[in-house]
Amino acid sequence: MAIPNIVSVSSIYGTTVNSVLTTTLTTTLVTAATDKVHKINLIRCANITDNDATVTFDQEVSGTHKIIANEITVPANSVVDIVDKSNGFYLQETDLIRGGCSAGSTVDCTISYEIMDDA
């Protein structure tokens, strides 16, 4: 298992996943596959209710969890970008992003990223 060299990638695949956040803050949203690097471009939260909610995201690296965003308020019926192109980051192989919300089925989450491979 080697980390791909992003200078000489052989393929880049654009990917988007959508999830409904639950009150379980340990829900895995994205996992980087073995021998791949994921460039996270966007984490967008859309509150689909008439009540404010808070969201929390973390990144797991080699079993250690580090907060990306902690209890960020997503106002009722609005959208908040947690990560965008100006502050994107990389997930190395087997790293993951987890997230949750103060109220289940309140916030829809969109994560857009590129999967890079040097095979």
Predicted regions and their residues:
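Asparagine-centered strand-capping/turn motif at beta-strand->loop junctions
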Residues: T31-A32, R44-D52, C101
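Exposed aromatic-hydrophobic patches
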Residues: V80-N87
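Noncatalytic modules at the cell exterior or secretory-pathway interfaces
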Residues: G88-A103
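C-terminal interaction-tip segments
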Residues: M1-V37, G100-A119
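Short proline/glycine- and polar residue-rich coil/turn motifs
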Residues: I72-V80
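Short beta-strand/loop motifs in extracellular/secreted proteins, especially
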Residues: N41, N51-T56, S105-C109
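A short beta-strand element within beta-rich, extracytoplasmic domains
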Residues: H38-N47, D95-G99
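Short, surface-exposed beta-strand/strand-loop-strand elements in extracellular ectodomains
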Residues: D50-E71
